[in-house]
Amino acid sequence: MELIVGPRLFSTWSLRPWLVLRRAGAVFDTREVWYRSEAEKAELRRLSPSGFVPLLKVEGETIWDTLSISEWAAERYPEAHLWPVDPTARALARSATAEMHSGFHALRDLCGMGPDHPMAGDARSPAPSDPGLDRDLARLVVLWSQMRERFGAGGPWLFGDWSIADAFFTPV
């Protein structure tokens, strides 16, 4: 099994399934690919149906996208309890994960993961008055507070025990 990821210092999308697979106890190799040059982009398009990372090569199949890889791991390694056991907590963990996967655009655009990222630095620092970032941060505080208040008694993570939701919010 091979997880193909983007640059480890910069790719939050790649970090998420790597964390999930590690937490599941999966044995896998990791290959880091870059996509700066046209040749690198062409190689990535050859490897990935979507042309993006991450992707998981397993049993002759290619699974792409952070959420798909994470769901595959939850089904493949049920003993790892990658989603909360409680049905309500599980549904809300999936909702929070999907929201991070598809939302928080200003946060992801303006607040990169790595300090050495080409888009980081004083010139790219978000202005405190950025309305999109303000909305994203306010939503993040509400979301985390609600999940911890409702489900956090069992441990230090968003839903008490570690879950895929924690992997998706780790880069934040």
Residue ranges: model-predicted function:
Residues 100, 104-172:
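GST-like fold's C-terminal all-alpha helical module
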Residues 1-127:
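GST-like domain detector, emphasizing the conserved glutathione-binding G-site
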